[in-house]
Amino acid sequence: MFRFDIFCVLLLLTQVGCNKSSGIVEYEVDRESDKVLTTDLLREQFDPIPFRWKVPAEWTEGENDQFSAIAWTVGSKSDPARITVSGLSAASGLEAQIVRWRGQLQLPEMAVTEVMNSVEDVTLQGATGKWCEFKNDTESILGMIVPHTDKLWIIKFRGGNATAAKARDAFRGFCESLKIE
């Protein structure tokens, strides 16, 4: 009735395993999120930027975040602005990016067609960019979005209204200097 082969397997299983002399070894490995991401490490995470530009002399290179391929700062310490270049999948949508900027400034919602009417086409060397400007009572976003191959290249200026007013022409000139390589 009782099968001998099952009995042997069960008996064998009771005899196998760790013996008392086997020590348990613990390993600790740092989580990847604990890694400090420097500007150079972050740049390596992005595709190469397909264009060149002329950076205004008053801009200083800033620290990257996980979204920007390169960053600069401009303005005083009391009213700094941040300029970033980021590459996103074209599937993310041009209109969605522009509407998102309005949301970041907590501006009233508008129909997408109405928002897009405020966007200006700018002819660049090798591409056409979309220029837009938004501001609330204290803060401004100036931006250029350049569709190129399968990406949207986002060039964004965000800072206080006073700094934005002073730096607008330099930022616009920077955007217009973009040259596709």
Locate predicted features.
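N-terminal targeting sequences that direct proteins away from the cytosol to non-cytosolic compartments
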Residues: 2, 15-81, 88-90, 99-113, ...
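Bacterial N-terminal signal peptides
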Residues: 5-15
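Extracellular/lumenal carbohydrate-interaction signature centered on repeated Trp-anchored short motifs
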Residues: 93
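Extended beta-strand-rich segments in extracellular/periplasmic secretory proteins, especially
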Residues: 130-132
